[in-house]
Regions:
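Short, low-complexity N-terminal tether/leader segments at secretion or assembly junctions of large
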Residues: 1-45
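Extended N-terminal export/anchoring regions of large proteins
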Residues: 21, 25, 36-226, 250, ...
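C-terminal, surface-exposed recognition/capping segments
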Residues: 55-98, 103, 426-434, 459-544
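Surface-exposed intrinsically disordered loops and tails
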Residues: 143, 283-303, 375-410, 439-478, ...
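Short aromatic-cysteine micro-motif
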Residues: 159, 163-166, 198-329, 342-422
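Long, low-complexity, polar/charged, intrinsically disordered or flexibly structured peripheral segments
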Residues: 182-191, 361-404, 478-532
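Low-complexity, serine/threonine/proline-enriched polar segments
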Residues: 302, 309-311, 319-323, 344-361, ...
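Short, Lys/Arg- and Gly-enriched loop/turn segments at beta-strand edges
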Residues: 330-347, 435-443
Length: 544
């Protein structure tokens, strides 16, 4: 007679798991609780499930007046989020193929990622994984090099996280990465655990050498708080009409430990594009704002209004919620946005709505402006000009990556791993300077210097606190001319926080190599600030 085997029902197994889970939680054993939730995260089927697990774990571990947000974030990212996966990408070097398209390797093979929009939460197989799951926080750097987290997404309100007086950061696990060239291809790989040649992200280590379980990147481009202090949060006008020196001065008002944007952010953002989309550059995948350069004169004049009348065709190019200036040429002939009279009526104001109006039997589109001050307009004289976006444009995107309406239109900021990029203005890096020179053969040279301790960043000069990146010098023949080149490949830099070209040329183009431009303004000497990304209308030259 055959032996009878009684298999437990699914409900019985769930009950046993629940009992075991309750026992571990009741024990109060920190290591056991973290191991339990680590296994639950690895088994999760969606990012929403991981979000729920995070809240559950946090509530179990939080002890009012005892634990801190810093402590729990360190535990979650450093211990709970863990796996043995290796994520990678393989891309052709320009000499091998001019294609910008690579391929996923290792455990990334088969994973699918499609940028999302406000209307659609598209597939992102990476978001739920330990190495890619991300969390928004409100935080501040301290003068001693440490930092303090004041609010945490899913635990505190979004107003406290995104719109407080503090800086909004996005945290992600501090993984180990390695980048190298081999056999005509570029390889980039990421993992949770140490391995030969792998290093942690530089933004996961503070100036004291403390290595954290997470990295922190700003969620938004810098903007002004309601009190006029520079910061990083949602719903803030951009910092423009400003130089490297101006920006450093603005950040120093916030604290001596601040100086501004870091090149480390761009290096990480492009790495996320490469790992998730197997592309050498972001252009054409998540474009960012590269082609939103519009200027129109009023189709009809009015007095005491808060709007500009345009034709229907003109208004169709504008987005409600985007930023504009309103003014005229004054006594001059230039309609450049830097001319003060061009923003004398409204400066960095958002479009509140676009409505149909009929005046004197003629149909117009009224572009209504968020402003407290009414103004007069004159047909053919008053200009309305698009400007860089306020922060938070992509807050409504239903995913980690994408753009509000179209990731490929070039008309709006992009989003990668929950951080906004390319808002329509150059990003002036605080911690990098470029220096022109000439070598012994009479060729032009362009060297890069970095200062990653923002308290030591200077304005206009390279001091002993800066490090020359000896492996990154670009050389241009004495016969070359000023102008745009395109980046064939990025460099595998010794400084892991630097994004810099390995080679630029006129052979590469907007659809090949890294799909990004690099302007060459030849000089025999001189220090230059590092302007990255693009203004409103750089189109094919623009990229991370």
């Amino acid at each position: 007679m055959a032996e009878t085997v009684n298999l437990p029902r699914d409900s019985t197994l769930r009950e046993l798991v629940a009992v075991q889970k309750a026992s571990i939680i009741a024990s109060g054993n920190t290591a056991a609780i973290d191991r339990l939730y680590g296994s639950l995260v690895r088994a999760a089927k969606s990012v929403e499930e991981v979000n729920t697990l995070f809240v559950d774990w946090w509530n179990i571990c939080w002890k009012e007046g005892v634990t801190t947000r810093n402590e729990l974030c360190e535990r979650w990212f450093g211990t709970v989020l863990d796996d043995n996966r290796v994520h990678g990408t393989k891309e052709p070097l320009f000499a091998t193929s001019q294609s910008a398209i690579g391929e996923a390797t290792d455990d990334s093979v088969g994973l699918v990622c499609t940028p999302s929009t406000e209307a659609a939460a598209n597939r992102d197989d990476f978001a739920k994984l330990p190495q890619f799951w991300a969390l928004e926080v409100a935080a501040e750097k301290n003068a001693d090099g440490t930092h303090t987290i004041y609010a945490v997404e899913f635990i505190d309100s979004y107003d406290d996280v995104r719109r407080s007086k503090h800086l909004c950061w996005v945290l992600q696990k501090n993984t180990y990465t390695k980048e190298w060239d081999e056999g005509g291809y570029r390889y980039f790989k990421m993992r949770c655990h140490p391995s030969t040649g792998y290093e942690t992200w530089p933004q996961g280590t503070d100036k004291n050498g403390t290595v954290y379980g997470y990295i922190a990147n700003p969620k938004y481009a810098a903007g002004f708080d309601s009190d006029g202090l520079i910061g990083c949060g949602s719903g803030r006008p951009p910092i423009n009409y400003s130089s490297h020196s101006d920006n450093v001065g603005l950040w120093r008002k916030r604290g001596a430990q601040y100086a501004g944007a870091s090149g480390r952010l761009l290096k990480w953002q492009l790495a996320m594009i490469r790992l998730k989309y197997a592309r050498k550059g972001n252009s054409g995948t998540i474009e960012g704002c590269t082609g939103y350069n519009y200027q129109y004169t009023a189709a009809a004049g009015e007095s005491g209004v808060k709007r500009v009348l345009l034709t229907a065709a003109q208004a169709a190019n504008l987005f409600v919620g985007s930023s504009v200036i309103i003014g005229d040429k004054g006594t001059g002939t230039s309609a450049d946005r830097g001319v003060a009279s061009m923003y004398k009526l409204a400066k960095n104001k958002r479009i509140a709505s676009i409505t149909d109006v009929t005046i004197g039997g003629t149909a117009y589109k009224a572009v209504n402006i968020e402003t407290d001050t009414a103004f007069d307009t004159e047909a053919g004289v008053t200009y309305i000009s698009t400007m860089p976006y306020w922060s938070g444009w992509d807050d409504t995107v239903q995913g980690y990556d994408g753009s509000r309406y179209s990731p490929t239109s070039g008309k709006e900021p992009g989003l990668i791993q929950r951080t906004e990029f390319q808002n329509g203005s150059y990003l002036i890096l605080a911690d990098e300077f470029m220096q022109w020179g000439k070598d012994a053969d009479g060729n032009y040279t362009l060297d890069l210097y970095t200062c990653h301790d923002q308290s030591k960043v200077t304005t206009g000069s390279i001091t002993a606190d800066y490090t020359k990146q000896e492996d990154l010098t670009l050389t241009f023949a004495a016969s070359e001319k000023d102008g745009w080149r395109y980046i064939e490949d990025t460099a595998v830099s010794k400084d892991k926080g630097v994004l810099w070209p390995a080679k630029v040329s006129t052979t590469a183009g907007s659809g090949t190599g890294v799909k990004a431009g690099f302007y060459v303004g030849l000089a025999t000497s001189g220090v230059r600030a590092s302007w990255r990304c693009c203004p409103l209308g750089n189109y094919g030259f623009a990229s991370l």
